[in-house]
Amino acid sequence: MPKREDLKSVLVIGSGPIVIGQAAEFDYSGTQALRVLKEEGLRVILVNSNPATIMTDPEFADATYVEPITPEVVEKIIAKERPDALLPTLGGQTALNTAIALDKNGVLAKYNVELIGANIAAIELGEDREKFKGVVERCGAESARSHIVHAMDEALVAAADLGYPLVVRPSFTMGGLGSGLAYNEKDLHRIAGAGLQYSPTSEVLLEESILGWKEYELEMMRDKNDNVVVVCSIENFDPVGVHTGDSITVAPAMTLTDREYQNLRDISIAVIREVGVDTGGCNIQFAIEPDTGRVVVIEMNPRVSRSSALASKATGFAIAKIATKLSLGYTLDEIPNDITQKTPASFEPTLDYVVVKVPRFAFEKFPAADPTLTTTMKSVGEAMAIGRNFTEALQKALRSLEQKGSQLDFGSVNALDVPELIEAAKRPTTDRLGQVQRALAGGASVEDLYAATGIDPWFLEQLQLLNEVAVELKQAPQLHESLLRKAKRHGFSDEQIAGLTNNAEAVVRGVRQALGIRPVYKTVDTCAAEFAAYTPYHYSSYDQEDEIALHEKPSVIILGSGPNRIGQGIEFDYSCVHASMALRKAGYETVMVNCNPETVSTDYDVSTRLYFEPLTLEDVLEVIAAEERTGGVMGVFVQLGGQTPLKLAQDLADAGVPILGTPPEAIDLAEHRGQFARVLDIAGLIAPKNGAAVSFEDAKRVADEIGYPVLVRPSYVLGGRGMEIVYDEPNLLRYITNATEITPDHPVLIDRFLEDAIEIDVDALYDGKELYLGGVMEHIEEAGIHSGDSACVLPPITLGQGVVDRVRDATQAIAEGVGVRGLINIQFALASDVLYVLEANPRASRTVPFVSKATGVQLAKAAALIGTGVTINQLRTAYKMIPSLPGTPGGFDGGSLPVGAPVAVKEAVLPFSRFRTPEGAVVDSLLGPEMRSTGEVMGIDKHFDTAFAKSQAAANNALPTEGKVFVSVANRDKRAVIMAVKLLADLGFEIVSTGGTADVLRRNGIQSSTVRKVAEGTSAEGEGTITDLIIAGEIDMVFNTPSGGEARGDGYEIRAAAISIGIPCITTVAEFNVAVLAIEAMRSFEWNVTSLQEHAEALLEAAANV
């Protein structure tokens, strides 16, 4: 059936901010979908609150709404745009839940909007656990025995029937939020209690434990003519009990017999038919009991998911793109496969390689969190690698993580340590893979480890094989060709071989190259080379035949940012993709090197060629060598992907590779304290007093000179890793004692901490002569909170033009002094009207996408062209990429936005609800100099107060417009909050506070009821404490600033209670003052929805009328 002609416009719902469990894979699938819809000639309307996505670029939709994804806001967009259809299957759980709400409350019917890509009945059958159980039974398969409960007393009755341990799963949450394993009644109270709150339907499923069974998933697609394809089978390395997003996964499944696989296939096809998914994809998860072979269907997702992004990258089969075409009425046999151009989408992909995905965690950011892996997803990113066998793919994936200790350690193991390693491996943690491999190296048997961990013996034998190769390397008198080739085929890096043979890495590389042992590059082509592939999507292997074609023009290589992590996320991928788009448009051949399966950059048609490879020096040099021998290399971009490629800059330059854009010397100069201080001196700028120390004596001397409080941190970090504000000498001693690896090359840096300063963030472009100021952002929280976690506003709302002009001059001087060609990000602090320079980063920063969306100027594209020699003047005139000069008609830049320009607020999204201490409490939500957010949202409006209110709603932290507010602040903050609290009381809010704060408020004529502190406990009359009130749902917002020492305990309990039930919890005075303004605005004005395209027109109009 050809496509439907009755649909003229479609509204697509995105997935909002990046949170654990719902990450960049939805930007990847959404971007593909928008392209298809545009190609098919539809008017496309998008709503997505995340500015760091490619899909919110104005060119991908006709109307792009960066607005909170809530049913109320989406209804406003529907009323304004009147779309014919709504496509909700590309925005994860957020989009599905919103679509279900709009259907239930009659909005879709009222405006005559049809749901495409999924029907509500199919979603409910797939997502509602009770209904899905019925589906599985009707298909002749079985589910785990279970009970659905809606209250705690029902849960206790169910537990008596099922027996402990049992699995708790709330309905309609994603990434396993609120789920867990209850081993006893106490656990059940804790986990099911939270689960009932997290589930939008207050419904929780309790099921028998299938812990230790083998877990598999199948990724499926079905069209309305009942054609079904299995895109890919995926096997989890860890048995059931670890969320699939936190497990190492392998495609295709390795340990199924053909009969077992056909059985899973038959069940899947029956289930997808019974559920009625007929225009798209879904994934179905299974558990198999290893001893009996009993198969249980765990669950299905009737939408594009994290697994489908992985399956797409693993097979080259564009699931999101094909699902979108199906939703428009096409069938699988009518859709051509882009890669082969000969086969239709109804051909199932065939793999002649192995794919391994390994998760990346961020437990170092939450030292209090319990690192045990459970059914609640905790990983923040993932790396994927492709090899000709499992061992090669596994080792490549582990080195792609770029984490200390992520690679296998082949050092010798004492036999006495083996029992301890086996015991430790029983509990799934991030270290389990290493523990298992080392236990095997120490002589443990495969049987023992299988009994302890439930990891399939086939995987254990593969680890044993790696240990054997390592032993051979250790014992070899010299490196001979057959041994070296064998090691490379099992994925050993030059660095690992050097360690095992007591050589330098450069020596191993020299010997290997002299022996002619180089990798060849194979192609991911969906058909195991049965047909020719037209899209070069490559992976390396130490095999025989090379499959790279010759190219005519020298290539421009862009190094991506590797796996997502806190501090380096999708924002850097955005800059890489923009660079590739701009350079291709300008006629260059672009080559992307990256190993993150979730991102747009690793889509097979974003660049001219894609290499799915780890971002290590060895792997990158081999890609460059391959490009050199097939047509030459013009140069490499290292400043777009964050810290990952920057670290390689100097080594690449030393190897003779041309670096485009800012040279490595300039990158080093900005990172090096002494040299950078000279740049500031010449420019007449000042930094906060600072020093460096390699011992406690040094540190004490520096801190005494500067004066406390001081900010201490290691050199060369991204995301503020290991930073702390230290208020006194005992704490300085503690920091230095705990700081690892202080060396003369890597000293600890100590800065004066500026209290009560306004922090300012600048993104700019510099071409060697001229500066274009991209944006000047003012932070809402005071200095001392990491810029990645602080809310900020553009244009700045309290800085006068005089300050902005000083910022512009300082930026020009620094860019010139450092020698930047392209993007630079500088952080300033304004204290007592003195402008301090905090740091300069000569690279694409985390705020580039936000600034680009807020001002309509795409900075990363411009920076890529500057890297190839284009000037800012040419970008203005010939390329029309940046506006004309400020002061000329229609001219402006990020430091001179006209009055009437829209105001944009960026807010961070924090993952505290995911991380629990071993006792089950939430980790503390206090912000500090170490970055902890996983993603961001943007609120944009004509007025600052409304823009701030939108940003809070988008960050799932909507401000209340009535009710009770709890206020408890440290003594130093009491004066600063009186006016704002009075305004809340005047607006009709009821103020609740503890002793000291209540007295101050009453003396200022503010009515406030007093409540008991946590430490006071429940009174004899049964009056509860503040945390009891919060947990009972009686408080609508918490405002609590920490005061040192003892009250930290009290404050922590209060903040943890607020986070655990999901009410706004504000911890800084600055943010509270702004929140009160926003609440007042929400009560007085109806907010409007405006598309980025309309904001851009308003901005140009305002500039023309200056």
From Swiss-Prot:
Region described as Carboxyphosphate synthetic domain: spans on this chain: 1-402
Positions contributing to Mg(2+) 4 binding: 839, 841
Binding site for Mg(2+) 2: 299, 301
Chain residues that bind Mn(2+) 2: 299, 301
UniProt pathway annotation: Amino-acid biosynthesis; L-arginine biosynthesis; carbamoyl phosphate from bicarbonate: step 1/1; Pyrimidine metabolism; UMP biosynthesis via de novo pathway; (S)-dihydroorotate from bicarbonate: step 1/3
Positions of Mn(2+) 1 binding: 285, 299
Residues that bind Mn(2+) 3: 827, 839
Binding site for Mg(2+) 1: 285, 299
Residue ranges occupied by any MGS-like domain in the UniProt entry: 957-1106
One Gene Ontology biological process: 'de novo' UMP biosynthetic process
Key words of the record: Amino-acid biosynthesis, Arginine biosynthesis, ATP-binding, Ligase, Magnesium, Manganese, Metal-binding, Nucleotide-binding, Pyrimidine biosynthesis, Repeat
Residues the record lists as binding ATP 1: 129, 169, 175-176, 208, 210, 215, 241-243, 285, 299
Family, similarity comment: Belongs to the CarB family.
Name this protein carries in UniProt: Carbamoyl phosphate synthase large chain
This protein's encoding gene: carB
